[in-house]
Amino acid sequence: MAAAVAGSLVDKLVCLWRQPYTRIYLPHLFFCISLVGSVLKNAELVPESYFSSSRNVLNLYFVKVSWGWTIVLLLPFIAYSNFYIKSHMFALRRLTSLLVATLVWYICTETFFYIEDITGSCYESNTMVVIRGEFDTKAACRKAGFFWDGFDISGHSFILSYSSLVIMEEMVPMLHIQPAYRNPPLDCLYLALNVIVAIWIWMFGCTSVYFHDIIDKILGTSCGILGWYMTYKVWYVKLFSPGLPPQPKQHT
């Protein structure tokens, strides 16, 4: 019974993702959410809610470790779906895309931290009247109980858009596997990935309407989209790369 319900949900999700506009317009959706959310935030049109606090459950247990969730779910899905369709060697090659994605995530987040450190100052409080010059990094300042003010590119906007787009690309094999050849483990992984994407998009929207300035969010979102584009649309189509997930023409 449970397997039948899962299979039915997978069929509906596959139909959704098969629509060309779903995958084509997802990057545009993130930009639109950032812009509209920022306008709403500046106009103070969105009331405070549970999600306006950074202590909400989704932020604490999902977004704060978002890359961990992405890797934990994508690793078995890529291995299983790519091996199921192609071969061991193809699956191993495709798994290197997770190493590349992790490198992109690490470089971008560390760069954001560095920029915030070199552009910021430590203050005794958020009134930013008394400066504490003995602290030259955000980490040291915050550890001492003070307030750091620097150019804070939105890491949430980056990681949530980037993770969603990477997952979108890696779920492509499910669009072309006939239902008769699927199995419960693969269906469950696919459902979990779709749930995670839904959470990422929702929390991306919450970030847009409750946190950061517009430039912080646009830069973070741009980095996420650029990281996805330069890998999946530029590098992975070339021979010496992790390659793309199995595409429609590869399924016979």
Swiss-Prot record:
The encoding gene: fitm2
InterPro entries given in the database record: FIT (IPR019388), FITM1/2 (IPR046401)
Record bears the keyword Endoplasmic reticulum: yes
Known catalytic reactions: an acyl-CoA + H2O = an acyl-4'-phosphopantetheine + adenosine 3',5'-bisphosphate + 2 H(+)
Cellular component terms per the entry's GO annotation: endoplasmic reticulum membrane
Superkingdom to which the source organism belongs: Eukaryota
UniProt EC number: 3.6.1.-
Family, as annotated: Belongs to the FIT family. FIT2 subfamily.
Lumenal compartment segments: 47-59, 116-156, 212-223
Active site: 156, 212
Pfam families: FIT
Localization (cell): Endoplasmic reticulum membrane
The protein's name in its UniProt record: Acyl-coenzyme A diphosphatase FITM2
Membrane topology per record: Multi-pass membrane protein
Major subcellular location class: endoplasmic reticulum
Expression (tissue specificity): Widely expressed.
